[in-house]
Amino acid sequence: MGRLVKESIAFQNTTFFDELTLAFDEVKNLKETDVGDSEPIYRISKIIKNHTNLNITIDAENDYPPCIDIPNIDRNNPLINAAQRAIVNSTDGLTMIESSNEVLHGTVNIKTAKVSGVFSDIKAKMYLGKAFIQGNKYSSQELAAITLHEVGHLFTYFEFITRTVRTNQVLAGLSKILDGSENQEKREVALLSAKKALKLDKLDLSQLKDVNTKTTQVVLIDALVKETRTELGYNLFAESSWEYLCDQFSARHGAGVHLATALSKIYKSNYNISYRSLAVYLAVEMIKVILISNLAFLGILFLVVMLDSQDGGGYDLPSARLKRIRDQATQYLKNKQISDVERRRILDEIESIDKLLAEMTNRKQLFTYIHEFFSKRTRDERAYRKLQYELEDIAMNDLYVKAAEFKLMGNT
């Protein structure tokens, strides 16, 4: 996934995940009427604050599914897709700037998975419906994994704000130098500094030798956009990028396998097409064909097709999503410094995820096949996804898993 993955958070220890799990153990022992205003729920907010410095309050009074209300800081954040951008704004961010008597400062540390400064002051609300978090459907570990995923939404949102601000600062500084200097040598030094700061290794500075400041800014921004694409030429900020980064945030805190089992339960409860037997799959598709033959049922058909769709919504296909969570475990095995106990734990998690993947299929709706046949863009996107997944398989192949197994055998 190009630069996006290279700047992901580092692998963390499991303390954050373990503390969340213990808090959910206590939540499960409460009466449903007592959950919303309980000490364990407040403690979840404190645990999040302690490990990330993020200021997140938990709302367990309602029955919303797990989600986080992202503050309206910057509607132009690259992680927000075009459809979302049409209905969000930057009011919170503008209010912060207008009400502050000094320059706002903040950092996002991807090595420690912590924020500081203004990012630790911004308030956000996470919804964990009491009906969802109680009962026996989801274990405390699965709830902790889901919570980490939602925390990841806010963390990565702030991370991409810092990237945008960094770019703006470089461009502003460059403009000031270029506007105030006719000296060609100073221009070249300034452009070279901007190239290094923005990590535009492939940019040819000779094309900027005799152009004005505004054109220079346009060229640099265009180069940055191209840098956000993968080597395959597909936009890096695809709809699934944000969800993928949040899954990764959870997995890199040691919750990968529990996130995978939670997702499997969610997919099954939604009767996802990936879990249907051949007989059920064919029966459902036949019903859709029958509905399309009757104009009176077209509205119902549209609803059924939308609910049954595997496309859009910002998520990978179920099997691809679990496979990418598995890849995080494989990536961790590349660390030669981990203990045999850790290595055994990761291998067990990979085995568990493999069992979940074995239950899935990659079936698509009949209407999806028809759409792909008539839409070249859709075919190209499917081909890109397939190639991207194949390249990821090469990078995260099972040689690392087998090597870890042999290492354990050699140490026994």
What do the PLM-derived regions correspond to, one by one?
Residues M1-S99:
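A metal-dependent hydrolase signature that marks the N-terminal structural subdomain at the beginning
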Residues G2-V35, D92, A262-T412:
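Cytosolic-facing loops and C-terminal tails of multi-pass membrane proteins
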Residues D34-G36, G135-N136, E239:
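Short consensus segments that form the blades of beta-propeller domains
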Residues D69-T147, V151-I161:
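Active-site scaffold of zinc-dependent metalloenzymes
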Residues I80-A82, I87-N89, H105, K186-I221, ...:
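Low-complexity, serine/threonine/proline-enriched polar segments
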Residues Q141, L148-G173, G180, E185-V189, ...:
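Catalytic Zn2+-binding segment of zinc metalloproteases
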Residues Y157, V165, A172, K226, ...:
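Hydrophobic alpha-helical membrane segments
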Residues E182-Y281:
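Short helix/loop segments within enzyme catalytic domains
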